[in-house]
A protein has these predicted regions:
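Pyridoxal 5′-phosphate
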Residues: 1-171
Length: 171
């Protein structure tokens, strides 16, 4: 739901159109729905594994389809990452996110992976802390990646706990 609400807000603010891909009776995307990814598509966002039915999605196929039309592919790995190996380079997604609490980590933790080339061209959305490199009276220079997206104090304890949870699940 959080993912959907976010995209609804983006569409309301920008005038973009939100479209959906539906599953067939066996829990797979139909060719008709995959054909909705066309040259007008800017972003394809989807879950690697359904949190309702547990169906695995063909991540590499969907990412390749998105890239074939110049769209960005965003994969929600909250349901998949705790249970299966995740290789963002292999799936070639542009962004990949998962929450820590679904991996035995603490609440309010998670990971957002983004391709460096895309992140480098993005503006920070939160201001302060380590994301600032230098401040002048009339301008500010933002820090390099990954720091330009790390405003405020970091949740060090949560990051350490998430690292331990990842190590535990790897074994």
């Amino acid at each position: 739901r959080q993912d959907l609400v976010t995209w609804q807000r983006v569409c309301q603010k920008t005038g973009a159109v939100l479209d959906y891909m539906y599953l067939d009776e066996e829990g797979h995307f139909t060719e008709e729905d995959l054909a909705k990814i066309d040259d007008k598509t800017k972003i394809v966002a989807f879950a690697a594994v359904s949190n309702v039915f547990g169906m695995k999605r063909p991540v590499k196929e969907i990412v390749a389809k998105a890239h074939s039309v110049g769209a960005i592919a965003i994969v929600d790995g909250a349901q998949s990452t705790p249970h299966m190996k995740t290789d963002v380079q292999d799936m070639d997604c542009d962004f990949f996110a998962f929450s820590g609490h679904k991996m035995c980590g603490s609440a309010s933790t998670g990971v957002l992976y983004g391709k460096k080339a895309i992140l480098a061209g993005m503006e920070p959305f939160l201001l302060g802390g380590d994301m600032i490199e230098y401040v002048k009276e009339q301008s500010t220079t933002f820090n390099e990646l990954p720091f330009k997206f790390e405003a405020g104090s970091q949740n060090v304890e949560g990051a350490v706990a998430l690292h331990a949870a990842i190590d535990y699940l790897r074994d």
